[in-house]
A protein has these predicted regions:
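Short, well-ordered beta-strand elements
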Residues: 39-51, 70-75, 98-99, 150, ...
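Short, low-complexity disordered leader/linker segments with a strong preference
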Residues: 1-44, 66, 437-441, 445-455
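Glycine-centered hinge/linker elements that transmit conformational signals in sensory
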Residues: 187-190, 230-262, 303, 307
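Extracytoplasmic "Venus flytrap"/periplasmic binding protein-like
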Residues: 63-134, 170-172, 271, 275-280, ...
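Hinge/lid segment of periplasmic solute-binding proteins
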Residues: 104-158, 212-215, 299-308, 388-397
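Conserved C-terminal helix/tail region of periplasmic/extracytoplasmic solute-binding proteins
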Residues: 71, 169, 393-455
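C-terminal lobe and pocket-closing loops
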Residues: 124, 285-298, 311-420
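Extracytoplasmic/periplasmic solute-binding protein
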Residues: 145-154, 159, 182-234, 268-270, ...
Length: 455
């Protein structure tokens, strides 16, 4: 992976608004409790509360624990809270967790600071693991400057547009394979039906650099904007950044879901999955849940197309939720056993056979897309998902050169705080208590302060 241009000091806290949900914690429930041997065979895992993580919590006790004798105590948190918790624990060397879900943004930075175990040694030595099968974009995003992998991808994703085929057919509308944002806005206007509780589109409005600004930064990119130009000049109040943000905010205010300022990935998944929105632009990983009839009312009724664009050919983001092992763990062997199991081919088979093939945590292994059962269950979205991942370009996601890697984020330590602070004001603009102009004027000042570290 191309070297990050990072500042030497990491701001230790990721700021962010609370996700508005209570933390859920649980234990795998297997094995005996108490006693030295039991404690030695128990590891702690911190993970984001997405469907794929909820699935692994269900499957661990009856499978991994029975096979290995290792009990896993899970703590599940909403995304913003997860980011705060894991950053505090890892950065402060708290040692509370043996494994944790982290993303493509954190891993290269934390690897540089020596906070994570490298996993290349274990993965290469384990022939059954078949590390060569892992998708290159995902491995590259989790690689440190030394060329070693510091987290194993659990599932990978880009972003695409999901739409309710029944609603489009009823309105006589046809969704193109590569829509523009202008077309999406027209569709949202025609399909918005607030009287019957249906939004034209669902878009994240919840503050957080990895919440609201995940989709919004891709809009900024395709509108010709960027957080910083190649010389580290802040561009937050540039015409392109402002045009993209105004477009996004107005689209949500006019045709978006109710409660948009508090809506993140989870809330939009529920809204769209309940048939309460005509379109949703978000993570490709949402498709598995949407196609599960036990979890979604729109299973079999969803169409999937590439992320909407304006000035670029593609605009999907690139992300992976991955399992990392903090340097502070005293149970590295058991932690690796869990990580290798959770990211293995066998685990994908386990999910497919027990929970349904559409729920396989995909986007990380080439072989996944050759499994007949998965191909059949994922035929509506597999090709667009893989194409979106392959076309995501963290080196050049927009129309101008960038000073650091990242599609929906800037690969520097300060971005977590910067992105979250600006997102809070943009969310306030969606709520009607502030304006885009104020949000970006204030954001420009914050970005200029960050840029001083790199000039």
């Amino acid at each position: 992976m191309e070297e990050f241009n990072v500042h030497k000091k990491l701001s230790l806290l990721i700021a962010g608004a609370a996700a508005g949900a209570l933390a859920l914690s649980g234990c795998s429930g297997a094995g005996s409790t108490g006693g030295g041997d039991s404690a030695d065979n128990t590891i702690t895992a911190l993970m984001v509360g997405n469907p794929q993580m909820e699935d692994i919590q269900k499957l661990t006790a009856d499978n991994f624990t029975k096979q290995t004798g290792i009990t896993v105590k899970f703590t599940i948190l909403p995304e913003n809270e997860l980011r705060d918790k894991v950053t505090q624990d890892v950065a402060n060397q708290g040692g509370q967790y043996d494994v944790a879900t982290v993303g493509a943004y954190e891993v290269p930075i934390w690897a540089k600071n020596g906070w994570l175990h490298e996993l290349s040694t274990q993965s290469s030595a384990d022939t059954a693991y078949d590390s060569a099968d892992l998708l290159k974009p995902m491995v590259q995003s989790l690689t440190g400057e030394d060329g070693k992998m510091y987290a194993a991808p659990f599932y990978g994703e880009s972003s695409f547009l999901m739409y309710n085929k029944d609603m489009f057919a009823k309105a006589g509308l046809t969704m193109p394979e590569k829509p523009t944002w202008a077309q999406v806005a027209q569709f949202a206007q025609k399909l918005d039906d607030k009287k019957n509780g249906v939004a034209g589109i669902c878009l994240r409005g919840l503050p957080g650099w990895g919440e609201l600004f995940a989709p919004l930064t891709t809009v900024v990119n395709t509108y010709g904007g960027t957080w910083f130009d190649k010389d580290w000049n802040a561009q937050v109040n540039s015409p392109e950044f402002k045009e993209a943000t105004n477009f996004y905010v107005n689209l949500v205010k006019q045709y978006g879901e109710s409660g948009a300022p508090q809506a993140g990935f989870t809330e939009c998944l529920n809204t769209f999955g309940q048939g309460k929105a005509a379109m949703w632009y978000d993570a490709t990983s949402a498709a598995g849940t949407l196609e599960d009839p036990n979890a979604s009312k729109v299973a079999g009724k969803v169409g999937y197309v590439y992320a909407p664009v304006n000035k670029t050919e593609y605009s999907g983001w690139l992300w992976t939720w991955a399992w990392a092992m903090p340097k502070t763990t005293k149970k590295a062997d058991n932690a690796w056993k869990f990580i290798s199991w959770a990211t293995s081919k066998d685990y994908e088979q386990l999910v497919g056979k027990n929970l349904g093939w559409s729920r396989v945590p995909s986007g990380k292994r080439t072989s996944t897309y050759s499994i007949p059962e998965y191909k059949d269950s994922a035929k509506a979205f597999a090709d667009v998902t893989l194409g979106s991942i392959e076309h995501a370009n963290p080196q050049n996601p927009g129309v101008q050169p960038r000073p650091a890697l990242g599609v929906q984020f800037v690969g520097i330590p300060e971005f977590s705080d910067l992105g979250t602070k600006v997102s809070q004001e943009v969310s306030a603009a969606i709520a009607g208590s502030s304006s885009v102009d104020k949000a970006l004027t204030d954001g420009q000042k914050l970005a200029e302060d960050v840029a001083k570290n790199y000039k």
